Amino acid sequence: MLPLKDAIAEKHSLAEKMTFNQRMFNGELSDEEYTLYLCQQLAIFDAIEIHELPHPALDRAGKVFEDIKELTGGGQIQITPLVATNEYRKYLNTLTKEEQLPHVYLNYLAIMFGGQMMKSKVPGSGKMYEFDGDMNQIIGSIRAIQKDEWADEANKALDYNINILDELQRLSESTSGETAVDGGEIA
């Protein structure tokens, strides 16, 4: 059996090369486009965070919501996830805490590592990328439970994330950045 990192390398590379992801990394997203991305992240984190995380500092939903409020000027915010995000969220809601751990590994470590570079490239202050506490302990909380057997499920998580990035890019191209943020709750 391949180590987890090697087993997901191909799809991880594909996700990194998605047009929307590249535009985000290059600092090319408008406030509206990034806000729409954050809305998708909030829906995903809300679904994952119904279960206890390996470390309390991993909680992202609150930080993402702060970023959304900052970029939209606060007030009442209605968040409508994209079709691809709803599919992922529905899938996550079928999983037990143990079954969700590969999704924690993928979604949270991505923000902890790649997000540190991304923070300076995105609109707003990037609270989603800020973790309170010792980063080594926080990362260690995931690494301590990490299993190579997670490869299939982590690849499935990458498939969902690739679909979300693809839908974000298609929406971006068709609407020139109008968002599905009405103004929070997730619909």
Give residue ranges: language-model regions.
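Metal- and O2-centered redox machinery and metal/ROS homeostasis
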Residues: 1-187
